[in-house]
Swiss-Prot record:
Gene this protein is translated from: ras1
Organism: Botryotinia fuckeliana
EC number: 3.6.5.2
CDD domains for this protein: H_N_K_Ras_like (cd04138)
Binding site for GTP: 15-22, 62-66, 121-124
Catalytic activity as recorded in UniProt: GTP + H2O = GDP + phosphate + H(+)
Top-level EC class as recorded in UniProt: hydrolase
Subcellular location: Cell membrane
Name by which UniProt lists this protein: Ras-like protein
Length: 212
């Protein structure tokens, strides 16, 4: 039975321009694929759902990928509870930009770790792939977070990507609560340093399976 307590989660979708951040967000919220590319400055969406028998209100902020909005992006990062770092599997450059976004989040949050998930989007375009699944998984391993490949167009793993970051926020908050209750002090930035443990089964679940 789902809990009736409504917890709001502030999720921020970040990544380079044209990687499909808006398409993923709108597919989650409206179950609709947006075909045309219209660069985003800032859009906010809300959706109520049940994740692991707990009611959740997802407050999703879709951010600009263009470099000229980087100062505005830092403002979003201050309020976000969890981040989806999105690249396109068809763009090596967008993949390489993910490291910069991750470092920016940790700097703004003043943490060594914060809830994130690495998302390789456009996995329906296998013939145009420039970034292997192994590379995406390795980057996520380096970050200590989960990796998942998605397709907004084919609605592959869209819900899973957003639900997984909510699960990671819950796990992180429990660790923080335990850390505070334990009265620990001194760890680098005032919080637990433990990264997300991702099992081999969970790694496999992040793959992109296209039904022909």
């Amino acid at each position: 039975m789902a809990s009736k307590f409504l917890r709001e989660y502030k999720l921020v979708v970040v990544g380079g321009g044209g990687v499909g951040k808006s398409c993923l967000t709108i597919q989650l919220i409206q179950s609709h694929f947006v075909d045309e590319y219209d660069p985003t400055i800032e859009d906010s969406y809300r959706k109520q759902c049940v994740i692991d028998e707990e009611v959740a209100l997802l407050d999703v902020l879709d951010t600009a990928g263009q470099e000229e909005y980087s100062a505005m992006r830092e403002q979003y990062m201050r309020t976000g509870e969890g981040f989806l770092l999105v690249y396109s599997i068809t763009s090596r450059q967008s993949f390489e930009e993910i490291m910069t976004f991750q470092q920016q989040i940790l700097r703004v949050k003043d943490k060594d770790y914060f809830p994130i998930i690495v998302v390789g989007n456009k996995c329906d375009l296998e013939g145009e792939r420039q970034v292997s699944k192994q590379e995406g998984q390795q980057l996520a391993d380096d970050f200590g977070c989960k990796f998942i490949e998605t397709s907004a167009k084919s609605r592959i793993n869209v819900d899973n990507a957003f639900y997984d970051i909510v699960r990671e926020i819950r796990r992180y908050n429990k660790e923080m609560a335990g850390y505070t209750a334990g009265g620990a002090s001194g760890a680098n930035n005032g919080g637990p340093q433990g990264k997300m443990e991702v099992s081999e089964g969970e790694k496999e679940s992040g793959c992109c399976c296209i039904l022909m």
